[in-house]
Amino acid sequence: MQFAPLLLGVFLLCGSARGSDSSASNAITCFTRGLDLRKETEDVLCPANCPLWQFYVFGDGIYASLSSVCGAAIHRGVITNAGGAVRVQTLPGQENYPAVHANGIQSQVLSRWASSFSVTPGTNNLALEAVGRSVATARPATGKRPKKTLEKKAGNKDCKADIAFLIDGSYNIGQRRFNLQKNFVGKVAVMLGIGTEGPHVGVVQASEHPKIEFYLKNFTAAKEVLFAIKELGFRGGNSNTGKALKHAAQKFFSMENGARKGIPKIIVVFLDGWPSDDLEEAGIVAREFGVNVFIVSVAKPTTEELGMVQDIGFIDKAVCRNNGFFSYQMPSWFGTTKYVKPLVQKLCSHEQMLCSKTCYNSVNIGFLIDGSSSVGESNFRLMLEFISNVAKAFEISDIGSKIATVQFTYDQRTEFSFTDYTTKEKVLSAIRNIRYMSGGTATGDAISFTTRNVFGPVKDGANKNFLVILTDGQSYDDVRGPAVAAQKAGITVFSVGVAWAPLDDLKDMASEPRESHTFFTREFTGLEQMVPDVIRGICKDFLDSKQ
């Protein structure tokens, strides 16, 4: 009988351990989410030393179920990063999960989710700690492997884009077609290849008032995005697409909300029928913010309905460019699978994103060309070919890059200013038609003239200003002072010398670092080889200015 208490104690200890398998001893990983748990109330054990910066937490007090359980527990103050026992209570979904910084974790905003959970201190701490020690390096006491969390994949690295799907949530589309629209958007999202190093997506719903459903930063896995799209609710109201587009262009693509530097910004606008408001102004705002707008129109107005449309040209005025690439039509929301791949191919065509703010479409380049007698007519033509080849690399438009040219001898002549031509074809034609002046060489006066009269009117614009000086000889006046003044006015100066142009003068005119802003060739035929270097120099300076 003396062994009975001992045996009873062993039995109770083992029974307690077995009981903890089903209720209190569920060891989880740092990234187990609320939706990974299957019980309404569950006691779990969080491990120690979780990387706080990797937690995804949505809400405060009540957390969306896609939040990390351990992250939420630390955020709430239930445990520290030393780990510990947590009781998780499943709750209904809700709207407007807030963003709050607490205990080293920044939770994120989420507009709506289907289920939630709360966290409180766990029970049976001693049993949990014992189990925790036994599974510190292997598996939980149940003998089962820990639940796998969603692996973050790199995604399609050939399709780097930040994309907002602006879906139609108006009464025009109705609940049934709204669900079909969500299915189509989900298919597009999957085919894009969403991932940490691939495309990131978010959703904005257009209705009476626009609503950002989730941001770029909220999800970087296709499964998460699919689930979030599935949970979107239909809002109803007028199809104020213009209002939603303007709101998205201004608010959606901030660095705080997940936008990435150097990645094209895209808004894909889904429109069932036609908008209730004006899209032209919204399109202008989007282009000013460097956003590439696509319009996917479904069930376009019939002939009888055209009288109800405010502006039948609303698509052409809203898209990034009216060249056919940015507009996409589907006859209905039924049988849309075949339209998924062509749309994805468009969205992944990085080189076609003409409205992104890049060095190619966000600069003003002024060419100051030497027309002195030492150049000669034939060499002057080679100089014009040089500036034409540089200009060809840039997207010239009324909202993009702009080109101006000044020819100088002792005098100066503005061949054309930044506002004279807004297409590449017209700029190249104007360059071809420049007539050789012949005369002396007063480069310093020409720099001052160009700074004042050519760059002066655009100094407060959005584009970055560049001056490329092309000369074949020594100036009769001072060049350093005027060049410094130009640089103080915000103009980056590149100097290109040919033949007898003194290297000291070229460096005196060039911006810092002078070595990378100074070019020289003995022969005029060597100018052609410098074209890529000058273009790269402009783009490097542009990118550096954006850091």
From Swiss-Prot:
The keyword Disulfide bond applies. Its main location: secreted. GO terms for molecular function: collagen binding. Keywords: Disulfide bond, Glycoprotein, Repeat, Secreted, Signal. Pfam families: LCCL (PF03815), VWA (PF00092). The keyword Repeat applies. It is found in: Secreted. Expressed in inner ear structures; the spindle-shaped cells of the basilar papilla. Weaker expression found in the inferior and superior fibrocartilaginous plates and skeletal muscle. Residues 24-117 form the LCCL domain. Monomer. This is Cochlin. It comes from Gallus gallus. The gene is COCH.
